[in-house]
Amino acid sequence: MVWSRDQRRKVALENPHMQNSEISKRLGYQWKMLTESEKWPFFEEAQRLQAA
């Protein structure tokens, strides 16, 4: 997932001792909190990458 890849790096750098499972939980919560319009650019990028 385009969004989670970038966000995972950011969260991991900000929280170097956080376990991967906790990072995943945090990312899942953050993704759910985004509106559809906030998510849309990431859906478009994923589609573009799949077509390439």
From Swiss-Prot:
> Where does this protein bind DNA?
1-52
The principal location of this protein is nucleus
Its keywords, alphabetically, are:
Activator, Calmodulin-binding, Cytoplasm, Differentiation, DNA-binding, Nucleus, Sexual differentiation, Transcription, Transcription regulation
User: Which PROSITE patterns does the record match to this protein?
Assistant: HMG_BOX_2
Compartment(s) of residence: Nucleus speckle; Cytoplasm; Nucleus
Molecular function, one GO term:
DNA-binding transcription activator activity, RNA polymerase II-specific
Which Gene3D superfamilies is this protein grouped with?
High mobility group box domain
* Superkingdom as given in the UniProt entry: Eukaryota
Entries under SUPFAM superfamilies matching the protein: HMG-box (SSF47095)
Q: Which GO terms describe its biological process?
A: cell differentiation; sex differentiation
Q: Which GO terms describe its cellular component?
A: cytoplasm; nuclear speck; nucleus
The answer, when asked if Cytoplasm is one of the entry's keywords, is yes
Q: Which family does it belong to?
A: Belongs to the SRY family.
How would you summarize the oligomeric state and partners of this protein? Answer: Interacts with CALM, EP300, HDAC3, KPNB1, ZNF208 isoform KRAB-O, PARP1, SLC9A3R2 and WT1. The interaction with EP300 modulates its DNA-binding activity. The interaction with KPNB1 is sensitive to dissociation by Ran in the GTP-bound form. Interaction with PARP1 impaired its DNA-binding activity.
Per the entry, what this protein does is: Transcriptional regulator that controls a genetic switch in male development. It is necessary and sufficient for initiating male sex determination by directing the development of supporting cell precursors (pre-Sertoli cells) as Sertoli rather than granulosa cells. Involved in different aspects of gene regulation including promoter activation or repression. Binds to the DNA consensus sequence 5'-[AT]AACAA[AT]-3'. SRY HMG box recognizes DNA by partial intercalation in the minor groove and promotes DNA bending. Also involved in pre-mRNA splicing.
Protein name, as recorded: Sex-determining region Y protein
> What organism is recorded for this protein?
Crocidura suaveolens
In the UniProt record, what gene is named as encoding this protein? SRY
